[in-house]
Regions:
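Conserved small/polar residues in nucleotide/adenosyl-binding loops
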Residues: 1-5
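Active-site phosphate-binding and catalytic loops of NTP-dependent enzymes
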Residues: 11-20, 58-63
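Structural motif
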Residues: 16-20, 31, 80
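A generic local secondary-structure boundary/capping motif
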Residues: 21-25, 160
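RNA pseudouridine synthases
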Residues: 24-38, 43-76
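Positively charged, low-complexity, intrinsically disordered RNA-binding extensions
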Residues: 75-185
Length: 185
């Protein structure tokens, strides 16, 4: 143990010893939050994440306290800003490529599939002429929480902003059904 500490103090230890860690908790009024991190110091990151939860009216919980409210899915987004994708043809192509479900919304087509198949499904759809915007694994909530209290809405927005601004945070997943007229951007 002392050799490792001396080596680290002398600058000889690996400088890029990063590890994945996941923190779970609740935001204001019980909004479920999962925070995926990549850190070189788990204790520092845990303290920072706990601080954000506490500061903005939530609390960090134990592992597994909210992950049962989410399902890991492959999510592929296709560009449909021009509205030129035919829904019937898209359904046929998506199912043929291996997609499970899809929906048209706000200038995009969002497809869900098994997370291990997302890249393959996206590649197949790209070959068929669809413009793939993204294809990644996401934690998709099974239920959503709506906040009606203005203070809760403000605190939830600030919590998400603080988490996303942290350099160690890779992804933030939540089940907040955020209001449409979001002025954060």
């Amino acid at each position: 143990m002392y050799k490792r500490q001396l080596k680290k103090a002398a600058g000889g230890a690996e400088k890029n010893d990063y590890e994945d860690c996941v923190y779970e908790g609740y935001g204001p009024n019980g909004v479920a939050v999962i925070v995926e991190c990549l850190t070189d110091n788990r204790n520092r990151t845990a303290g920072e994440i706990r601080h954000y939860f506490d500061k903005f009216g939530g609390n960090m919980g134990a592992t597994g306290c909210v992950d049962f409210l989410f399902t890991l899915k492959g999510v592929i987004v296709l560009d449909n800003e021009d509205g030129d994708i035919d829904e019937d043809k898209a359904m046929e192509d998506i199912l043929e490529a291996g997609g499970d479900d899809f929906g048209f919304e706000d200038g995009v087509v969002e497809i869900t599939t098994d997370p291990s198949a997302a890249a393959t499904v996206a590649e197949e759809l790209g070959k068929k002429g669809y413009k793939v915007v993204s294809a990644e694994a996401e934690q998709v909530p099974s239920t959503y929480t709506t906040l009606t209290d203005e203070d809760h809405i403000k605190k939830m927005g600030l919590l998400l902003e603080a988490l996303e601004d942290n350099d160690d945070v890779q992804n933030v997943w939540h089940n907040w059904d955020a209001p449409e007229s979001d002025d954060e951007d």
